[in-house]
């Protein structure tokens, strides 16, 4: 009896302690007179995210537009017990991402270098000072001159896309000249972007557009296919980084990591034996390897066997899903607006005709103004990376960083801050009638009127997307070769309005986007 009473007393004491600790934790913003979203005990503001009712990015958008915070520069939130800030003021956004980058130079997300070296060395999640060195070493590969050199490789994949569409529409139109091909447009874009990244990042031709069962394509699909373990791993990495050393999640699954190691090693060995010289990103990785071999400090992180594979994995993550989704959303909007699609097609055909041999050139793509406008408006309405996050890292070992004069509060060392570029891109204050797809927003005259920091599909500041230019070129070439000889139309299976997937961290359609594709 006494034993049972002691157990009961211990349980009550523990629960009481947890309750008191929880109450004290959740008055953090209240004590600092910062308006905040009311948390749920133990879960903070993540209860809907944990129930898969709403992605974290969609939740931040909802908080951003909450009437209670209309005039607030910042909003307090909680990741379980961790206080965090949602930034609403654009000048404060500039301060965090650009002007005082040194105080917010790391991402909050984390991989443990002991259990997941590939994740920790990837450019996306690397911490200072490793991040700065990796970024500096990779930057030359993404310069404009390098893009021009890679253009012929990218054009090959564009031609494969056009061939694929011709075969697709020919096979499905037999016996019915008016029918066309009803396709899941994202699936087609996935094949194109898989081939593109395989070529320019891995130095391989995967031929996904000619053989949809390619090995590279299969591994890439597995990377983005959600399952329970993958969801848990990513949740811990991005929202519970303090538990990363204990739970040891991996940014890339072990089978995929091993596949990347094998592919990179084989390609590098072939290049070192005097294989074909290609102006691709693998040449840059080979240069990094040679530089590392010359260093006397063999313990330097560039000597780790996963360093090169980690960078290739970064190219893969950044170049397949994001570009595929962007292309899909652009084609969806163009299918709903045939006149806009026709205007773009005229520009595309003029670009081909500008070259005597009828081939597309890098310079011709650079001159396509309406294509630029369509892509930029797509990325405004559908920013595939819908939020930006940083960790407070004050300099000189300070514990706090003041947000004055923009907000009457401060962030403490290690605190995450979030910026909802999805919400900013849909704020009527900056973008009138934000749900309307209107490329004219990005005409030369209208771009001059845009509020600074109101358009950030690739982030901003020193830690913006290093592959922005190559990603834009990849999307543009995909649209050019898709619409050059084909048109897209809505059909009975086309969704009337895009609903975003609550289970996906990136911006993705909950339903498949079906469009009718036909030859011209």
Curated annotation (Swiss-Prot):
It is a peripheral membrane protein. It comes from the Eukaryota. Gene3D superfamilies: Cytochrome P450. It is found in: Endoplasmic reticulum membrane; Microsome membrane. It holds the Pfam family p450. One of its GO terms (biological process) is insecticide catabolic process. Its EC number is 1.14.-.-. Its cofactor is heme. The keyword Protein transport does not apply. GO terms for molecular function: heme binding; iron ion binding; monooxygenase activity; oxidoreductase activity, acting on paired donors, with incorporation or reduction of molecular oxygen. GO terms for cellular component: endoplasmic reticulum membrane. Heme binds at residue 465. Keywords: Endoplasmic reticulum, Heme, Iron, Membrane, Metal-binding, Microsome, Monooxygenase, Oxidoreductase. May be involved in the metabolism of insect hormones and in the breakdown of synthetic insecticides. Belongs to the cytochrome P450 family. This is Probable cytochrome P450 6v1. The gene is Cyp6v1.
């Amino acid at each position: 009896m006494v034993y049972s009473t002691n157990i009961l007393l211990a349980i009550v004491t523990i629960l009481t302690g947890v309750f008191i600790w929880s109450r004290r934790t959740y008055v953090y913003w209240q004590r600092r007179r910062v308006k905040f979203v009311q948390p749920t005990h133990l879960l903070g503001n993540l209860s809907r995210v944990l129930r898969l009712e709403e992605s974290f990015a969609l939740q931040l958008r909802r908080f951003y537009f909450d009437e209670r915070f209309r005039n607030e520069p910042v909003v307090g939130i909680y990741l379980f017990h961790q206080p965090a800030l949602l930034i609403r003021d654009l000048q404060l956004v500039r301060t965090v991402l650009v002007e005082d980058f040194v105080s917010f130079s790391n991402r909050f997300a984390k991989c443990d270098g002991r259990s997941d070296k590939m994740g920790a060395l990837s450019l996306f999640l690397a911490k200072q000072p490793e991040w700065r060195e990796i970024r500096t070493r990779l930057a030359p590969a993404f310069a404009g001159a390098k893009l021009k050199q890679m253009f012929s490789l990218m054009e090959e994949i564009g031609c494969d896309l056009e061939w694929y569409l011709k075969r697709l529409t020919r096979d499905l139109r037999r016996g019915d000249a008016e029918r066309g091909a009803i396709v899941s447009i994202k699936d087609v874009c996935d094949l194109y972007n898989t081939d593109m990244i395989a070529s320019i990042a891995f130095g391989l031709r995967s031929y996904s557009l000619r053989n949809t069962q390619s090995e590279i394509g299969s591994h890439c699909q597995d990377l983005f296919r959600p399952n329970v373990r993958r969801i848990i791993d990513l949740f811990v990495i991005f929202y519970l980084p303090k538990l990363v050393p204990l739970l040891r999640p991996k940014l890339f699954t072990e089978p995929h990591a091993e596949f990347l190691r094998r592919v990179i090693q084989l390609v590098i060995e072939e290049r070192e034996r005097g294989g074909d010289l290609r102006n691709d990103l693998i040449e840059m990785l080979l240069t990094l390897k040679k530089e590392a071999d010359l260093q006397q400090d063999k313990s330097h992180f560039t000597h780790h066997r996963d360093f090169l594979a980690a960078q290739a994995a970064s190219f893969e993550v950044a170049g397949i899903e994001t570009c595929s989704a962007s292309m899909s959303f652009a084609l969806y909007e163009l299918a709903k607006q045939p006149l806009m699609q026709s205007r773009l097609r005229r520009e595309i055909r003029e670009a081909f005709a500008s070259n005597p041999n009828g081939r597309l050139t890098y310079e011709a793509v650079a001159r396509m103004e309406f294509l630029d406008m369509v892509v930029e408006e797509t990325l405004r309405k559908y920013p595939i990376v819908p939020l930006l996050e940083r960790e407070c890292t004050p300099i000189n070992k300070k514990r706090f960083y003041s947000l004055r004069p923009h907000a009457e509060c401060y962030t403490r060392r290690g605190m995450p801050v979030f910026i909802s570029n999805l919400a900013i891109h849909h704020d009527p204050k900056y973008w009138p009638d934000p749900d309307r797809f209107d490329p004219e927003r990005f005409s030369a005259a209208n771009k001059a009127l845009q509020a600074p920091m109101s358009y950030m599909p690739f982030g901003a500041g020193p830690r913006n997307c290093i592959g922005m230019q190559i990603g834009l070129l990849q999307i543009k070439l995909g649209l050019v070769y898709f619409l050059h000889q084909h048109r897209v139309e809505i059909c009975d299976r086309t969704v009337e309005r895009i609903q975003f997937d609550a289970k996906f961290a990136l911006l993705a359609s909950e339903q498949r986007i079906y469009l009718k594709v036909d030859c011209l």
